[in-house]
Amino acid sequence: MEAVTAIKPLIRVAALSGSLRKTSFHTGLLRAAIDLTKESVPGLQIEYIDISPLPLINTDLEVNGTYPPVVEAFRQKILEADSILFASPEYNFSVSAPLKNALDWASRPPNVWADKPAAIISTGGGFGGGRSQYHLRQIGVFLDLHFINKPEFTLNAFQPPQKFDAEGNLVDEVTKERLKQVLLSLQAFTLRLQGK
């Protein structure tokens, strides 16, 4: 008798990096996550959403319930996603300004973050960006985001062994496995919230 493998429904994940730097380690984590889903996490499809084109939030830009085209396109991508993957750097114990700006634009009526499962990954020195995660979780309460609790993913990018190459690509295999566990947890949590 042949083994039957259950095919998991496709989960679309919108991935946002709070760092705009060209060789950002956070964007590198998202590239690695995309590669991992292609290699070893079937049923998960990650799309990187570039937040750099978003204008600073300004309600004067809202006209008759509509937003600038770049904001409308961003909001539509969030709306169409089943879940969210945030790569959140820590700036002054908090989230970065570009990420907060994206959170604010997508929270304008109607709030397109509402009821989305989410996960946070962070890297940096010292605490590996962990303090930004707690602030992002706090913001997420108001936005009705539902974060996975475990595994937490923080990474000291400057401790040996080398974690990233000169272009910001994740090269450490142990870290890739930790990242994979976050993706599997996000997948399972999303399916649970969807009742599947």
Curated annotation (Swiss-Prot):
Pfam families: FMN_red. It is found in: Cell membrane. Gene3D superfamilies: 3.40.50.360. InterPro entries: Flavoprotein-like_sf, FMN_Rdtase-like_dom, NAD(P)H-dep_reductase. It is an enzyme of class 1 (oxidoreductase). Its cofactor is FMN. Coiled coil: none annotated. The keyword Cell membrane applies. Belongs to the SsuE family. Homotetramer. PANTHER family: CHROMATE REDUCTASE, NAD(P)H-DEPENDENT FMN REDUCTASE LOT6. The enzyme apparently serves as a quinone reductase in connection with conjugation reactions of hydroquinones involved in detoxification pathways. This is NADPH:quinone oxidoreductase. The gene is NQR.
